[in-house]
Structure formats: C-alpha cells, structure tokens
From Swiss-Prot:
It comes from Arabidopsis thaliana. Xyloglucan binds at E104, H117, T118, N119, N127, R128, E129, D193, W194, G198, R272. This is Putative xyloglucan endotransglucosylase/hydrolase protein 13. Keywords: Apoplast, Cell wall, Cell wall biogenesis/degradation, Disulfide bond, Glycoprotein, Glycosidase, Hydrolase, Secreted, Signal, Transferase. The gene is XTH13. May catalyze xyloglucan endohydrolysis (XEH) and/or endotransglycosylation (XET). Cleaves and religates xyloglucan polymers, an essential constituent of the primary cell wall, and thereby participates in cell wall construction of growing tissues. GO terms for molecular function: hydrolase activity, hydrolyzing O-glycosyl compounds; polysaccharide binding; xyloglucan:xyloglucosyl transferase activity. InterPro entries: Beta-glucanase/XTH, Beta_glucanase, ConA-like_dom_sf, GH16, GH16_AS, XET_C, XTH. The active site is at E100, E104.
Length: 284
C-alpha cells in the first residue's frame, strides 16, 4: 500500500476534524444538571454517560432552546437486567402549558426487550402514547434516535426509519407545538412502580450502577437560540428539513414498524376514550 503524502495526511486530518466538529461537543452543547457526579462528559467532549444507583440517577440538558429542527442523538442503553429503569430523551418547553416530544426507554429483565415509549404534549396535555419494541438490541451498540419537528409534522425516527408521525392538524382544532422553544433533556432514573411490566418487576439494585451512553449529537438543521434575543440562523440554505414530510417509501417503513413492533397505540384504545378517540386519530 502506498504511503500517504503530506498533503493527503493533512486532508485526512482535516476531514476527521470536520467529522468530529459536526458531531457536536457535549461541553459546548449541554450542561449536566443533576446526579452529583453520576453524569460525566469524557473523550474530549464526544461521549456523555449517565449512571443510576440506589441513591440517585442523573441527567443533563441543552444550553440552547429550539423552535423546530432535526435533532439526532446516538444512544446505547443500560445493558443486562435494566428492570425499573427509565432512560428519557425528550424536548420540552416550560410553564403550565408546556409542549413536549418524548422518547422514553423502559428497561426490562435480562433477555426481554426494552419498550420505547413515545408521547407528544401540546399546551400541557399529553395522553398521546405510542409504544414499540425495537428490532435490534439497543444495549449492544449505539443507535440514532431522531426528532424531526417542523411546522408540518413531528416525525420520530430510529436509525433513520420513521416509527411515528404527529401532523399539524390545527385547522381541525388539534393543538400543535409551534411557538414555545424547547430544550433537550435526558436522564436515567428509577421508576419501578410502573416502568417494567406495569410495575410488576422491580429494580434489582445488585446490578447497580446502571449506565447509558450518548454520542454524535447533531443539531445542525435547527432553529435555535442561546438567549432571549439571540436567535441563531435557521440554516436557510439547507433547511429542507423545515418542510419535510414522509414520502411513500417512508410511509411503507413506518407501516412495517407499526405492524410488527408497535405494542400500544392510544388511537386504538377505545376503552380509554369511551367518549370517542382524540380528534387527530381520525385525521392521521
């Protein structure tokens, strides 16, 4: 194999640096907010870990607020017996009428699958849960979890595959998050009163500390701000994400996920809504 020239080596170094910068440093983008040392940023800002023990969990939040965007995070979840643990990754605004977009990963006993719990809150109202099993082991390696939020819809994606869409149906009286900036939050915590098999399986603290890892954060395609008056450019030259909806191929992918891996859908829970399903269920 031919040796690299100096020019080639510099080009390769520049490319690697660009890849590193595009992934986003956790030092630059996030603050650890709780856990008393149980959350740590390592590997020169490229990896963040959250841990949970019997005393406390841990968590972090973004420095920026976002009003629409395509946000990626690679995550590797708690391995082994993770029963009773919840790894939450979500966007949320503040106040009593907050908006929120949720990924929550509910742990399970060894050999049993995680449950991916999703929800959308508008004006402080949620009750829009959809739950899934994953088609891979989320503890064996990192996988990418994406929220694409624009004026038209909110799309939840796993490794680029859409699993759920919440459309803007304001014209039909359904509230839609479009005016309240949100921060990104994530935490690892214990909720064994409900998280695993409805609370039947409790956390086995002999397996603690539990740990989840994060890397390759990407918020390049976003409208964001770092202060009330400091809005960052919304990448006007590359903002195809701002008007993205699912194409026919992506609808096919989502149908595959929902047919084969969905385990709960609020839009089919007639017992929960005896007076009639939420309006959007008949529109989406």
């Amino acid at each position: 194999m031919a040796a690299f020239t100096t020019k080639q080596s510099l080009l390769l170094l520049s490319l690697l640096l660009l890849i590193s910068l595009s992934a986003g440093s956790f030092y630059d983008n996030f603050d650890i907010t709780w856990g008393n040392g149980r959350a740590n940023i390592v590997e020169s800002g490229q990896l963040l870990t959250c841990t949970l023990d019997k005393i406390s969990g841990s968590g972090f939040q973004s420095k920026k607020e976002y009003l629409f965007g395509k946000i990626d995070m690679k995550m590797k979840l708690v391995a082994g017996n993770s029963a009773g643990t919840v790894t939450a990754y979500y966007l949320s605004s503040k106040g009593e009428t907050w908006d929120e977009i949720d990924f929550e990963f509910l742990g399970n006993v060894t050999g049993q699958p995680y449950v991916l719990h999703t929800n959308v809150f508008t004006g402080g109202k949620g009750n829009r849960e959809m739950q899934f099993y994953l088609w891979f082991d989320p503890t064996a390696d990192f996988h990418t979890y994406t929220v694409l939020w624009n004026p038209l819809n909110i799309i939840f994606l796993v490794d680029g595959i859409p699993i759920r869409v919440f459309k803007n149906n304001e014209a039909n009286g359904v509230a839609y998050p479009k005016s309240q900036p949100m921060k990104i939050y994530s935490s690892l915590w214990e909720a064994d009163d409900w998280a695993t098999q409805g609370g039947k399986v409790k956390t086995d603290w002999t397996n603690a500390p539990f740990s989840a890892s994060y890397k390759s954060f990407n918020d390049v395609d976003c409208c964001s701000r770092t202060s009330l008056l400091n809005w960052v450019t919304c990448n006007a030259n590359s903002n195809s994400w701002m008007w993205t909806t699912l194409n026919s191929n992506q609808y096919g992918q989502m149908k595959w996920v929902q047919d084969d891996y969905m385990i709960y859908n609020y839009c089919t829970d007639f017992k929960r809504f005896p007076q009639g399903l939420p309006t959007e269920c008949n529109l989406n």
